[in-house]
Amino acid sequence: MIKEAIGSLVLGKSLTLEQSASVMDEIMEGKTTPAQIGAFLTALRVKGETAEEIAGLANVMRAKSTRISTSTPVLDIVGIGGDGINTFNISTTAAFVISGAGIKVAKHGNRAASSMCGSADVLEALGIKIDLNAEQVKICIEQIGIGFMFAPVFHPAMKFVAPSRREIGIRTVFNILGPLTNPASAQYQLIGVPEIGLGDKIISALCHMDIKHALVVHGLDGMDEMSISGDSVIWELKDKEIIKFRHTVSPREMGLEQVSLQAVKGGAAEENALTLRAILSGAKGPKRDVVLLNAAAALMVADKIDTIAEGISLAAEIIDNGLALNKLESLIKLSQSLASG
């Protein structure tokens, strides 16, 4: 199938959902060569990925991951990355706030690819054991309401793709598949994208996936998160129907002060870990505000509240009551205990 797919792509022809799924199945089963994988990824990038191609690839990659089955539906909040802005770990900080609201969070992430500090890097710097197996992460999610799935542990079949990706050295569809391939089958998702056009594709791809409620967000300043330095664009999907498309949200409308992008910049893992802990401990300022905004959007996705404005108030209450910090401390303690046997 991969040879036929490459032939179609170089002619500018898009693949169907089923064709792209068949190609990914061959790749994940180790039935393709590195040269074929490199040619496929390059041809797909040059043509430009369609929503159906993205969904077909993502559905198989998720199915081939090491799965986690939870007793209740879970939420994931993640930025695709690649915005080049180097903010602190906004989504990761927000994850503890969301968990503090009683939403089960299955955070799926990796080390930094294009930024200085990925979710895995900052969690490790906080003392969390990031390389837990599926059963151990499930215990974290069920017992304390939040767990972290380190992508290399949960996607062993990516070993077939890694050499080709490294050798061709360009951004490929795999750079955007991570947020769509949560091993716990997150039914609720907030996904940040670095470009508007990518938001259009991702929300359309989610229509072909097993998702109950999702928001795709983009800061018009370039952030792959909701921004407080300018307006943000959101796309919303509920029960496989797109109900918002390129809807604009202003921080001022939400009662938040608009600040420069510099105010939410981050650094290396140790610095970002201190920032995360300070925010969850109640520190005020722009970094708290951007976490409140993104946590609020995720709380709306989880159907905890009806509007983002309502979610901001709830997120602030969760932080100020110490519930978010408690989730962080609990995950540090439990992950270390599980890792030590």
Curated annotation (Swiss-Prot):
Record-level GO cellular component terms: cytosol
Recorded coiled-coil stretches: none
Gene Ontology BP, a term: L-tryptophan biosynthetic process
Pathway stated in the Swiss-Prot or TrEMBL entry: Amino-acid biosynthesis; L-tryptophan biosynthesis; L-tryptophan from chorismate: step 2/5
Binding site for Mg(2+) 1: S91, E225
UniProt: 5-phospho-alpha-D-ribose 1-diphosphate binding residues: 79, 82-83, 87, 89-92, 107-115, 119
Protein name as annotated: Anthranilate phosphoribosyltransferase
Source organism (scientific name): Dehalococcoides mccartyi (strain ATCC BAA-2266 / KCTC 15142 / 195)
Biological classification of the source: Bacteria, Bacillati, Chloroflexota, Dehalococcoidia, Dehalococcoidales
